[in-house]
Amino acid sequence: RQPLGAVGISYQLLDLGDQDLRDGQGNVLGSVSFRDHLAILSFGLQVLPGLDTGLNFKVFQSRITCRGQCTDAGVTGTTYALDAGIQSEPFSELPLRLGVLIAHVGPNLQLINVEQADPLPTRLRAAVSYETLRHFTDIPGVELWITAELEDRWRELGSPILYLGGELVAGEDDLFFLRAGYGQQQSGQNAGASVGLGIRYQRFDMGVAKRLSGSSLTGESEPVHISFGVVF
């Protein structure tokens, strides 16, 4: 029997840090914390041989909370978003993948009032990926995928950002991933490389990633990103 598809659930926490709240004389009155929460429900389905489609429904919440002698308890904003994409392997004997995605489609994020609501960063992405190791060696269970991706703003098409990446996959049932990528300069980010690795063992997935360049807004380095998943 053909499976109906796959369903996934994930949660992401972005800790943006804390900041002291001070009076005019510099005395610490309290502490303000900044946290972003993202819950994702995903569904994927093979609609035709060599053609897959996927959909994400996301709930995003941004929280600014204050502890101590605060004028208010903070603010919270919640919004919803959708991602939708398709991936095709048009040639059965050629390890080539093509994909198109529209991401972060949803209502504005409102923290204070409607006039100050922020639109979501809706993006259009198109990518191509090719397995290159087959031209150099024939090691069972080892693949090297090279990917090129263009990303553009949905509301201001015409200035796409280019991303290049590679993923070395080793194993069959239990897998090891080694990843590297490079992205062009964009708003808030310097051009630079990223590295990462991942492990899939039985029902468990774990990944670690690090962007080597810092933010062009703060000058600080990017944090290490850690992900963990369980397949039921």
PLM region spans:
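Outer-membrane beta-barrel porins/channels
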Residues: 1-232
